[in-house]
């Protein structure tokens, strides 16, 4: 209170309880999209960890659902009348895996099949998978999504299916680092607590929606 009174300004607290799940997952992105940080000059985010460190590089996330629509039929009695959505999805899954050493070699793509049909004697007319597409930069992961859309188009032609790609949560950007702020915070934190903050960068493995904030507010 005394600091604010002497320097002026305002402290704003954004609460984000359970912000990682549900349709509004990575909810800080929603805050950014709604312009809640437009008049904020600087932001601090604290996250529990096993050590104290400066802001780290993080990966982007494109959280997408992939759906295939086909035509049901009896798998033994009249398989020729069906269009197997699961076959198309499995082919898509394997295609993504094959590209991990090629065009997607700099990306981290992982996912699960969430719906592959209900009974083995029925050709599934619907199949669904959920993926996280992670990259070093937002441009890189977004370009991967465009490539995946092209792959889906090709699979639809081959299997006579219809596919759909949708985002099931907010997308997550890469972190824009501000070394000057990290240095200032480290000096104040170490002087005040007597603890040491690690200054180096580690290989990015995770993601955070605080990165979305860093694109509009340091």
Predicted regions located by residue number:
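Long, contiguous binding/interaction regions
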Residues: 196-197
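Substrate-recognition/cap regions that form aromatic- and gly/pro-loop-enriched pockets
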Residues: 217-218
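Midchain, well-structured core segments that form catalytic/ion-binding scaffolds
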Residues: 38-183, 187-189, 202-211
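Glycine-rich, small-residue loops and helix-cap segments
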Residues: 214
